[in-house]
Amino acid sequence: MTEYKLVVVGAGGVGKSALTIQLIQNHFVDEYDPTIEDSYRKQVVIDGETCLLDILDTAGQEEYSAMRDQYMRTGEGFLCVFAINNSKSFADINLYREQIKRVKDSDDVPMVLVGNKCDLPTRTVDTKQAHELAKSYGIPFIETSAKTRQGVEDAFYTLVREIRQYRLKKLNSSDDGTQGCMGSPCVLM
């Protein structure tokens, strides 16, 4: 069974835990209890493949920012979550993305931009803005509601598909026969 290490990042109060718990346990948590770090595992079938999702739900609060480098190192893909009624959380996405790229030492890291709380009538982040940001990053954008479950599976499953594409790309680039021992082609004798 293939395992995927997913990390949910974003500012405090955007609904990272609510999204994760909705996916794992099929229910909505409406009381806010700031997370330090929680880990969840769930077996799912995505596009016919049985997968084990290892999901790390992270702290949005600034006082836990020192822990970020560690989980960014181990994560394979990132759900970058903002709340559609919180412009600051949307602006913060760039900070998370830059930190992920720095820690991973790569511009090419599987990510999905997630606009949560789309069930709320008070929107301060326009869908068009979010689509444009995602397009500029070259990543998918999905609107979700942890309350109604809208887009929840789609967000996590899309991230798994992004990780699959990334793994294939890595496999193909290292499997083209040109790079062998010490950077030169290997010769079998």
Curated annotation (Swiss-Prot):
The gene is Nras. InterPro entries: P-loop_NTPase, Small_GTP-bd, Small_GTPase, Small_GTPase_Ras-type. It comes from Mus musculus. It is found in: Cell membrane; Golgi apparatus membrane. Palmitoylated by the ZDHHC9-GOLGA7 complex. Depalmitoylated by ABHD17A, ABHD17B and ABHD17C. A continuous cycle of de- and re-palmitoylation regulates rapid exchange between plasma membrane and Golgi. This is GTPase NRas. GTP binds at residues 10-18, 29-30, 57-61, 116-119. Residues 166-185 are annotated as: Hypervariable region. There is a cross-link at residue 170 (Glycyl lysine isopeptide (Lys-Gly) (interchain with G-Cter in ubiquitin)).
